[in-house]
């Protein structure tokens, strides 16, 4: 899926929400701190959701 190749985007806001993104270099879903606005499709609420869509 295309969203799995998008880069991690923290965004400009300061909410500090724990999310997961698919790291195409390692082939794994990795946690990161999301700012709460901006961003892209490679931003999942749970590890399970990330793995399900990106097949990690």
Curated annotation (Swiss-Prot):
User: Keywords on this record?
Assistant: Disulfide bond, Ion channel impairing toxin, Nematocyst, Potassium channel impairing toxin, Protease inhibitor, Secreted, Serine protease inhibitor, Toxin, Voltage-gated potassium channel impairing toxin
Gene Ontology molecular-function annotations: potassium channel regulator activity; serine-type endopeptidase inhibitor activity; toxin activity
- Where does the entry annotate site (Reactive bond for trypsin)? 14-15
Q: Which domain of life is it from?
A: Eukaryota
User: What residues does the BPTI/Kunitz inhibitor domain cover?
Assistant: 4-54
Q: Which cysteines are joined by disulfide bonds?
A: 4-54, 13-37, 29-50
Q: Which Gene3D superfamilies match?
A: Pancreatic trypsin inhibitor Kunitz domain
Where it sits in the cell: the answer is: Secreted; Nematocyst
Query: Mainly localized where?
Result: secreted
Family matches, as CDD domains: Kunitz_SHPI (cd22618)
Report the GO terms under cellular component.
Answer: extracellular space; nematocyst
Extra remark: Negative results: does not bind to and, hence, probably does not inhibit serine proteases plasmin, kallikrein and thrombin. Has no activity on Kv1.4/KCNA4 and Kv1.5/KCNA5.
* Record PANTHER family: BPTI_KUNITZ INHIBITOR DOMAIN-CONTAINING PROTEIN, KUNITZ-TYPE PROTEASE INHIBITOR-RELATED
Spell out the protein name for this chain.
PI-stichotoxin-Hcr2g
């Amino acid at each position: 899926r295309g969203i799995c190749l998008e880069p991690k985007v923290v965004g400009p806001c300061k909410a500090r929400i724990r999310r997961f993104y698919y790291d195409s270099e390692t082939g794994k879903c990795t946690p990161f701190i999301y700012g709460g606005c901006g961003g892209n499709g490679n931003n999942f609420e749970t590890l399970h959701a990330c793995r399900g869509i990106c097949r990690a």
